[in-house]
Design a protein with these regions (language model features):
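Carbohydrate-active catalytic/glycan-binding domains of CAZyme proteins
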Residues: 1-327
């Protein structure tokens, strides 16, 4: 594996050890002859700001999902990546250490600041920075506390409708949506709506295209052979939702397992869309490190909207997907 060191940075090995991520690094994914970011990186949230890709994810590779820090990965083409420290849970005043750092999501608020939504202690918190590179400064309290709304409080996300209205998304076992404040630091719990979506497990995501709303999510546990991404379509966020249909499922023929927990992003100024999702760490022999559910990697693929309003199913492959921005 060939890696390129950033200035004032040591070259990392391929052991994928997890540390505090005190230094940025650069890596070229072409050396892998595969699509994924080379580190164990799960629960991806891909965003585009100011002509660059920004990827926020769970730093995987720790037993029992026990990572305690977040990084941000930055690229111009989905191949060459830089990594910067985003948030360490030791800096979060309400973190007790009972659960790790999971499932971050990013949004730019109405003031132009960047808000990182994240899970710790099975609660959802926020942290703020002036740039998407971070580092992010955590707020003093979580915005959704453990045990509220009758579901496991994980997997935050944000949907911004065409009129600028912001919605907060979250849930495990049941999907929830609620109006989100312009500063993206509070939600209106009195207007929260619980959605019944197939066999919803986690990672609710919403996007809009051609006047239709698309809700997508993961079903089953990440270690389950039936773990997959499904979606439904509606003309209104209130429903009714048609579906569900499969969007991403595992490809045992290519030894690609654990495909799920995604997000979807539009390339500004185009009708091109990208889906980011994780899978078990791949090995061509069929031996993979990710069978325990704690060793996952993030991959990317184009997402196509079909004329009938459906989404073309994404079929996991071994191979590169490179999409330079500004082209």
């Amino acid at each position: 594996m060939t890696e390129i060191a950033a200035p004032a940075c040591t070259v990392e090995t391929s052991t994928r050890t997890i540390d505090r991520h005190d230094l940025p690094y650069r890596v070229n994914n072409a050396a892998l002859a595969t699509n994924p970011l080379h580190r164990y990186c799960a629960d991806p949230n891909l965003a585009i700001f100011d002509g660059r890709y920004f990827l926020y994810c769970t730093d995987d590779g720790v037993d029992d999902w026990g990572s305690t820090a977040f990084s941000v990965y930055v690229s111009d083409n989905l191949m060459d990546w830089e990594r910067y420290p985003a948030l360490d849970l030791r800096d979060v005043p309400w973190w007790t250490g009972s659960d790790g750092a999971w499932a971050p999501s990013i949004v730019r608020n109405a003031d132009g600041r960047y808000v990182l939504l994240f899970v710790a202690d099975s609660q959802i918190g926020t942290a703020v920075a002036d740039t998407p590179y971070g580092p992010f400064i955590p707020t003093v309290e979580p915005i959704v506390r453990k045990g509220t709304f009758g579901c496991h409080t994980i997997d935050p996300g944000v949907f911004i409708d065409d009129d600028g209205t912001r919605y907060f998304l979250w849930g495990n076992g049941k999907a929830w949506i609620a109006p989100f404040s312009d500063d993206c630091l509070s939600l209106d719990e009195s207007k929260a709506i619980g959605w019944i979506l197939g066999d919803f497990r986690e990672a609710i995501w919403v996007h809009r295209h051609g006047g239709l709303y698309y809700a997508s999510w993961s079903e089953n546990d990440t270690r389950d052979p039936a773990y997959c991404v499904k979606y439904a379509v509606a003309e209104s966020l209130a429903g009714p939702w048609s579906g569900p249909r499969v969007l991403v499922e595992q490809n045992p023929g290519l030894h690609l397992y654990g495909t799920g927990h995604h997000n979807i992003v539009n390339i500004p100024g185009t009708d091109e869309w990208i889906i980011a999702y994780h899978r078990f760490a791949y090995h061509p022999s069929g031996r993979w490190a990710g069978g325990d559910g704690c060793h996952r990697e993030t991959v990317f693929a184009p997402l196509n909207h079909l004329p009938d309003g459906s989404l073309e199913q994404v079929r996991p492959q071994v191979g590169s997907y490179v999409r330079p921005l500004g082209v």
